Every structure is written in C-alpha cells, then in structure tokens.
Amino acid sequence: MKGLVRLLTVFSLLLGCWGWLGTTQIAQAGSLQSFLVPQIPVLAIERQNRADAKLATEFGEKIDLNNTNVRAFQQYPGLYPTLAKKIIQNAPYGKVEDVLNLPGLSDGQKQLLQSNFDKFTVTELEPAFNEGDDRFNNGIYR
C-alpha cells in the first residue's frame, strides 16, 4: 500500500510539474500603459534657507561682526582670542566703526581694529549663526 501511495504521489507531482502535458496557456505580456501615471510637468522653485542666503552676501567673504564665530578671527594676527572675544560679547553692532566703542580697548587694539576695517562687515543678527554658544565654540577641534 505504501508503494502505491508513493507511486501515485510521484506521478501526480510529475504531471503537475509538466503542466498537464502541455495544456497550459501561453503567458501574455501585459501593457505597462495601464500602470503608468500620466506625467505632469512640475514647476519647482529653488529653495534656500536664510543661512545660505546670508552666506551668498558679504558675510561669506568678510568677517561679520554680528554673526561670525571666534575662530574666524584666527586668520588675522592680533585679533584672536582676546579681541575676538570682546567683539562677540558686545555684539550687535550697527556699523563697523561701532567696534571702536568697546569698553577697555587700548590704543594699540583700536589701531589694530582700524587696520582691519576692510575685512569686517556688519549685517543683521541671524539666529542660525547666533543660537547656543556656536559663536564661542563651533565644535571644530584640531
């Protein structure tokens, strides 16, 4: 009896795998047009955040006394860290010349600042550059 069950099982599997001996239907390729969504042109505008917009102005080329961090002053001898710290702590400024009114500046420091006026600019305070303590420690360590 077990032999008959095995033979019947093997025969039915072979018959099923052969597809009833060629009686299967031919596969028809479907059209993709029924699945495609019609293409509609989208008019997109270039989005830019306020920080990127500010970097495209003078801010990206000069030191902005209201928004730049302390490390930016390293490239100018004599400004980092003492004068840079004073400048940042007493911001905001209305114009570049206002930096000469800082309390406790010596005549030498004032002359140093005046000699670098062409490297400074003043723009409105931007929260993206002033939030937290990023102006004092922007997390760049060497």
From Swiss-Prot:
- Under the cellular component aspect of Gene Ontology, which terms does the record hold? extrinsic component of membrane; photosystem II oxygen evolving complex; plasma membrane-derived thylakoid membrane
Keyword annotations: Electron transport, Membrane, Photosynthesis, Photosystem II, Signal, Thylakoid, Transport
Q: Which residues form the signal peptide?
A: 1-29
Q: What coarse category fits the chief subcellular location reported for this protein? A: membrane
Please give the Pfam families that the UniProt record associates with this protein: PsbU (PF06514)
Q: What's a single GO BP term from this record?
A: photosystem II stabilization
Q: Where in the cell is it found?
A: Cellular thylakoid membrane
State the annotated membrane topology for this chain: Peripheral membrane protein
Q: Which family does it belong to?
A: Belongs to the PsbU family.
Q: Which NCBIfam families match?
A: PRK02515.1
What quaternary arrangement does the UniProt entry report?
PSII is composed of 1 copy each of membrane proteins PsbA, PsbB, PsbC, PsbD, PsbE, PsbF, PsbH, PsbI, PsbJ, PsbK, PsbL, PsbM, PsbT, PsbX, PsbY, PsbZ, Psb30/Ycf12, peripheral proteins PsbO, CyanoQ (PsbQ), PsbU, PsbV and a large number of cofactors. It forms dimeric complexes.
Its function, per the record, reads: One of the extrinsic, lumenal subunits of photosystem II (PSII). PSII is a light-driven water plastoquinone oxidoreductase, using light energy to abstract electrons from H(2)O, generating a proton gradient subsequently used for ATP formation. The extrinsic proteins stabilize the structure of photosystem II oxygen-evolving complex (OEC), the ion environment of oxygen evolution and protect the OEC against heat-induced inactivation.
* Protein name as annotated: Photosystem II extrinsic protein U
Species of the source? Nostoc sp. (strain PCC 7120 / SAG 25.82 / UTEX 2576)
